[in-house]
Curated annotation (Swiss-Prot):
Record's keyword terms, sorted: Ribonucleoprotein, Ribosomal protein, RNA-binding, rRNA-binding
Protein name as annotated: Large ribosomal subunit protein uL24
UniProt organism field: Clavibacter michiganensis subsp. michiganensis (strain NCPPB 382)
Signal peptide: none
Record text on subunit structure and interactions: Part of the 50S ribosomal subunit.
Record's function text: One of two assembly initiator proteins, it binds directly to the 5'-end of the 23S rRNA, where it nucleates assembly of the 50S subunit. One of the proteins that surrounds the polypeptide exit tunnel on the outside of the subunit.
Length: 119
């Protein structure tokens, strides 16, 4: 089970400060997780300018120009945000017994280490 999943709220914990034009301290929602590259794409963080060539799409319209998109950031540079205190926290796992239709099942649950709340 992964520590960070799509849709989680994370905070950038390394890099240049916002005063110097960096992204450290910014919070955003995880748009996608690239497991094989150990990277995540975070909404509103790590923008790059991408030059797109003018070409035809399936609908026949021509698009192109310069656009800004979020680039992946290494998973070790972000921390999950505690839903209670809105501050970065570590992720823990605990096993719980869940009974469904008379069958007992063991399930791993993610929780915030600072507050102990389930994620």
């Amino acid at each position: 089970m992964a520590n960070i999943k799509k849709g989680d709220l994370v905070q950038v914990i390394t890099g240049r400060t916002q005063a110097k034009g960096g992204d450290r301290g910014k919070q955003g929602k995880v748009l996608s997780v690239l497991v094989e590259r150990n990277r995540v794409v975070v909404e509103g963080v790590n923008f790059i300018t991408k030059h797109v060539r003018v070409g035809q799409t399936q609908r026949g319209s021509k698009t192109g120009g310069i656009e800004t998109v979020e680039a992946p950031i290494h998973i070790s540079n972000v921390a999950l945000v505690d839903p209670e205190s809105k501050k970065p926290t570590r992720v823990g796992f605990r096993t719980e017994q869940v009974e469904k239709d008379g069958v007992s099942k063991t399930v791993r649950v993610r929780y915030a280490k600072k507050s102990g709340k389930d994620l």
